[in-house]
Amino acid sequence: IGMSNLGMMILYNMFNEREDVWCERVFSPWMDLDKIMREEHIPLFALESQEPVKEFDFLGITLGYEMCYTNVLQVLDLSHVSLLAKDRKEDDPIVIGGGACAYNPEPIAEFFDMFYIGEGETVYDALFDAYKANKAAGGSRADFLFAASPDSRNYVPSYTCNLQRRRHPVASFT
């Protein structure tokens, strides 16, 4: 089902054309497998190598529609990656959201390190190059995210001014 997503197929092939990138696939398991994985303490792993997702540099999540938001939490939890971006450690994967629902990322912003807004194939080469340069220079994940934040196509919640939300509860119905 997951590979029927044309955007995912394009990115998968594009990333794997680079000699310095190995892109693998991982999918949110159905309830029966989720239960077994939790009972047996099996972390979520990649389809190709069976390596735990937590060992990757990046975890890219395609957000096709709002109903899949809970799957994001399931994937992070099964991967043993902190749900909240602010709680992630230096060796955790950088969690990037993309796809149609990335155009309005605020409802789920606290779970992602960054979002790519727009057509992914236009910027990822620059993003991978920046990550590689940051790593070679001994930079941290925070350094990389900060460097990525000025690009208007990248939304990095931790480096974006948070707006105060005002709540005005309904006083009554007539």
Whereabouts are the PLM-identified features?
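Conserved alpha-helical elements of sugar-nucleotide-dependent glycosyltransferases
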Residues: 3-11
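Short helix-loop-beta junction
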Residues: 10-22
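ER/secretory pathway lumenal C-terminal domains and tails of membrane proteins involved
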Residues: 13, 171-173
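General small-molecule cofactor/ligand-binding pocket signal
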Residues: 24-26
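Glycine-rich beta-alpha loop elements in corrinoid/cobalamin-binding modules
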Residues: 28-165
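A conserved amphipathic helix/loop scaffold
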Residues: 164-167, 174
